[in-house]
Amino acid sequence: MADLDDIKDGKDFHTDKPQTNTLFALKGCGALDWGMQSRLARIFNPKTRKTVMLAFDHGYFQGPTTGLERIDINIAPLFEYADVLMCTRGILRSVVPPAINKPVVLRASGANSILTELSNEAVAVAMDDAVRLNSCAAAAQVYIGSEHEHQSIKNIIQLIDAGLRVGMPIMAVTGVGKDMARDQRYFSLATRIAAEMGAQIIKTYYVDKGFERIAAGCPVPIVIAGGKKLPEREALEMCYQAIDQGASGVDMGRNIFQSEDPVAMIKAVHAVVHHNETAERAYELFLSEKG
């Protein structure tokens, strides 16, 4: 505590310079409060306004799928190369070292499995636990046009309201029903609905035709899902096209941890997202880094 000795009056107030307050200039976040902007500034690189998320939350409904049998062996070596980790609270507490000091997007929906209807989800994490885990965002599926569309939207609304109370961003993940077409019209609808409900980030799929319309019509940042495993060159091309057409990053899982060389692949993805490398140049980087 400062004492009362030798107190000097302030003199240099720079009265000729107005005070500035630099906000985090991310799409759609200008009206958010300080705590939420601070969390978003950890997720999205403040210089590039982009992010490379490493998704390994698949086990919440798929179980120990290929590449995720042992998180501590297969995934932990990738942590240092990712901007953000996306996982469940069970894996976070049991496997992820706190000292890794990476922002976490916490999977907050669940209660389903690959043996049942995927759209039948519930909120699976209380907001106070997300805060306790020092998460930078919470994520939940929204299934537009599916059997349980109404409940999935209610889940998102519940999380958004809880997040606003504590400054926690919510990422809405556009799940696709079994009979839904993966096209621009559908994803424009799904992403816009989630944003209108108040989600601060949207995770959706890249489509070859019309993705720029999806990104332009969504008032908050979009990150693309990696989806099924693709050949490395194709996955990097998808990344490049998505960023070029307005995405604010990627949230990839299988296309990284099921790669021939996961470390080389995440480095190549990073080059596309943050350094605007073409898919061809990034693939050359992948080959040069490949062990």
Curated annotation (Swiss-Prot):
InterPro entries: Aldolase_TIM, DeoC/FbaB/LacD_aldolase, DeoC/FbaB_aldolase, FbaB-like, LsrF
Any single Gene Ontology cellular-component annotation: cytoplasm
Active-site residues, Swiss-Prot/TrEMBL: 203
Gene3D superfamilies, sorted: Aldolase class I
Keyword vocabulary terms for this entry: Cytoplasm, Schiff base, Transferase
Domain of life: Bacteria
Catalytic activities: dihydroxyacetone phosphate + acetyl-CoA = 3-hydroxy-2,4-dioxopentyl phosphate + CoA
Cell compartment(s), UniProt: Cytoplasm
Main location: cytoplasm
EC number: 2.3.1.245
Enzyme category, top tier: transferase
Molecular function as annotated in GO: acyltransferase activity, transferring groups other than amino-acyl groups; fructose-bisphosphate aldolase activity
Coiled coil start-end: none
Assembly with partners or alone: Homodecamer.
HAMAP family: LsrF
Similarity remark: Belongs to the DeoC/FbaB aldolase family.
PANTHER family: 3-HYDROXY-5-PHOSPHONOOXYPENTANE-2,4-DIONE THIOLASE (PTHR47916:SF1), FRUCTOSE-BISPHOSPHATE ALDOLASE CLASS 1 (PTHR47916)
Role this protein plays: Involved in the degradation of phospho-AI-2, thereby terminating induction of the lsr operon and closing the AI-2 signaling cycle. Catalyzes the transfer of an acetyl moiety from 3-hydroxy-5-phosphonooxypentane-2,4-dione to CoA to form glycerone phosphate and acetyl-CoA.
UniProt-recorded name of the protein: 3-hydroxy-5-phosphonooxypentane-2,4-dione thiolase
Organism the protein comes from: Salmonella paratyphi A (strain ATCC 9150 / SARB42)
